[in-house]
């Protein structure tokens, strides 16, 4: 085979065969195909698209490009939950312990922050001593004994995805359905879970800005997961507003703990209960209504909070911080952001909120950047709320004052205030099975 012919074929809008797709991924990982040719293929895919068959072949090729985990020695049903990324999305920290309380094994591999969206692993590293990089055998041992562990993605899993993502990131080919699907599902299928529930975000704070695109993404991922023999379900959820009030690593861990205490924000609690209920239902623990009640009971009984604390301890962290969240340090500096006019918050550009937290030090601009764990934003007002002129709408936190002016400017310009109250929009927009 020749890479030139494969690029030309896709450029002309023809379908690639499974053998051609496998060959490209295999040779690229082995270093036998240069970046510039794979860049050209990605751009051809961006413009010409791929069929579901091609995308399935690409996903499986990414999955098979490195090691595949064998969880057969983890006893019982194994589940995973994946979010396509949002702002203030700390659901994994709440959902995983709820599900584990019900005897379903959570062997979860999570990622770091990407662009304006936060990452579960970065959040967990705000807990002193917490180890996100565990040997596979220790990871499996904790899951078998406790029922839950959350670690960072193993570099030997789906190495093709790491190479492709780095390339797509600098060649303006991130926003392509087949490339997004194969990236997410290639990694997910390299792990050995039985059931996967996807939280597909839609709106200004997500990678998919419209409900139609998000639904298409959800349908393709669910179908490809089923083709790989997994039980699948996807929720399409609103990211036209941040989730909860906290944006930033330590701030979000504290809010997740409050949610496990039964004192969390309404939207975050609602979504976490729904995600946990769908996972339990997929794992055949009962009807959806029964599973929803189980999730609520896990919170009200304190069992889910205890499970989270036990997981932190098992992974080397200080569990007293979970049981006494006031131990989390406060940022050195804070600034109050006040409304410049009065009225209702009718909408926000969630991505800009995420970028504002990045400017404060809560995320990375480059791989080498060190995250300020105390940095972030606490929202005092959200979409639908009335604000008076001069009333506090948010508080910015950071270890340095240098990002405050730009972050405040970004936040205010991203907040739309009008005289008329907005219509209420549901948080969960659709379910794909």
Segments (PLM) and residue ranges:
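Alpha-helix C-terminal capping segments
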Residues: 47-48, 93-107, 187-192, 227-228, ...
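Phosphate/diphosphate-binding glycine-rich loops and adjacent basic-rich segments that engage nucleotide
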Residues: 144-195
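Acidic, glycine/proline-rich low-complexity segments that act as flexible tails and inter-domain linkers
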Residues: 1-88, 259, 307-318, 428, ...
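A glycine-rich helix N-cap at a beta->alpha junction
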Residues: 123-149, 219-225, 229
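Short beta-strand segments
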Residues: 109, 143, 151-154, 184, ...
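Well-ordered secondary-structure scaffolds
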Residues: 5, 10, 15-17, 68-69, ...
């Amino acid at each position: 085979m020749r890479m030139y012919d494969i690029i030309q074929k896709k450029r002309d809008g023809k379908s690639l065969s499974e053998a051609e797709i496998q060959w490209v991924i295999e040779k690229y990982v082995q270093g036998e195909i240069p970046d510039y040719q794979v860049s050209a293929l990605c751009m051809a895919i961006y413009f010409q698209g791929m069929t579901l068959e091609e995308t399935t072949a690409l996903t499986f090729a990414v999955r098979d490009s490195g090691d595949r985990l064998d969880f057969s020695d983890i006893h019982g049903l194994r589940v995973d939950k994946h979010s396509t990324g949002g702002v203030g999305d700390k659901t994994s920290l709440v959902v995983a312990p709820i599900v584990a309380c019900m005897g379903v094994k959570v062997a979860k591999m999570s990622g770091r922050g990407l662009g304006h969206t936060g990452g579960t692993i970065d959040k967990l590293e705000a807990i002193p001593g917490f180890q996100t990089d565990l040997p596979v055998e220790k990871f499996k041992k904790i899951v078998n004994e406790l029922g839950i562990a959350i670690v960072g993605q193993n570099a030997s899993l789906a190495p093709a995805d790491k190479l492709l993502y780095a390339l797509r990131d600098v060649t303006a080919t991130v926003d392509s359905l087949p490339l997004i699907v194969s990236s997410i599902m290639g990694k997910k299928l390299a792990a050995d879970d039985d059931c996967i529930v996807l939280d597909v975000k839609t709106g200004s704070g997500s990678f998919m800005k419209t409900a139609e695109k998000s639904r298409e993404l959800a349908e393709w991922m669910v179908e490809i997961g089923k083709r790989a023999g997994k039980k699948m379900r996807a929720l399409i959820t609103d990211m036209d507003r941040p989730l909860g009030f906290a944006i930033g690593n330590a701030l979000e861990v504290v809010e997740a703990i409050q949610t496990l205490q039964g004192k969390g924000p309404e939207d975050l609690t609602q979504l976490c209960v729904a995600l946990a209920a769908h996972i339990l239902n997929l794992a055949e623990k009962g009807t959806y209504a029964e599973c929803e009640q189980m999730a609520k009971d896990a919170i009200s009984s304190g069992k889910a909070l205890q499970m989270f604390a036990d997981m932190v301890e098992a992974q080397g962290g200080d569990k007293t911080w979970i049981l006494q969240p006031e131990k989390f340090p406060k940022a050195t500096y804070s600034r109050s952001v006040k409304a410049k006019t009065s009225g209702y918050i009718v909408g926000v550009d969630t991505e800009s909120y995420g970028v504002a937290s990045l400017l404060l030090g809560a995320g990375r601009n480059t791989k080498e950047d060190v995250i300020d764990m105390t940095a972030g934003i606490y929202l005092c007002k959200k979409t639908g709320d009335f604000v008076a002129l001069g009333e506090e709408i948010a508080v910015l936190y950071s270890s340095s004052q240098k990002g405050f002016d730009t972050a405040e400017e970004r936040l205010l310009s991203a907040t739309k205030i009008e005289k008329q109250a907005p219509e209420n929009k549901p948080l969960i927009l659709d379910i794909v099975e």
